[in-house]
């Protein structure tokens, strides 16, 4: 990587960081309290890396229904136990972070959500719509 490329690369924190899920926003985002240092916690929205979920502010009834289903599935997967965050970086719209999320039983959240077909794989770029 060139010096310019290295300077412009988004910083990432390898982790893992333990986090307690406080609420689920939608099918790919949740609010968590993350333990960043002993006795130090932050509340932050976490976007699950590698997935695209239907939007809660939907363009059609089918997308809204799919968004509610995806949110319910994410809440079920995350459960009550702490989760582990790794490969942590600022998301496109900073104010939330992008991370790989693993449940307490070792389930990779993105893989489980994609396997359920409630969400689509996402690697950046333009996303497909959910209404057509």
What are the language-model segments listed below?
Residues 2-132:
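Small beta-barrel nucleic-acid-binding modules, primarily SNase/OB-fold domains
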């Amino acid at each position: 990587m060139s010096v310019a490329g290295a300077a412009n690369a988004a910083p990432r924190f390898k982790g893992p960081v333990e986090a307690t899920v406080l609420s689920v926003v939608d099918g790919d985002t949740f609010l968590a309290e993350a333990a960043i240092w002993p006795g130090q916690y932050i509340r932050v929205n976490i976007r699950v890396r590698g997935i695209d979920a239907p939007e809660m502010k939907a363009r059609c009834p089918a997308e809204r229904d799919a968004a509610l289903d995806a949110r319910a599935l994410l809440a079920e997967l995350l459960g009550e136990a702490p989760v582990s965050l790794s490969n942590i970086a600022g998301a496109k719209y900073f104010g939330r972070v992008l991370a790989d999320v693993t449940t307490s039983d070792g389930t990779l959240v993105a893989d489980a959500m994609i396997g359920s077909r409630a969400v689509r794989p996402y690697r950046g770029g333009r996303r497909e719509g959910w209404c057509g």
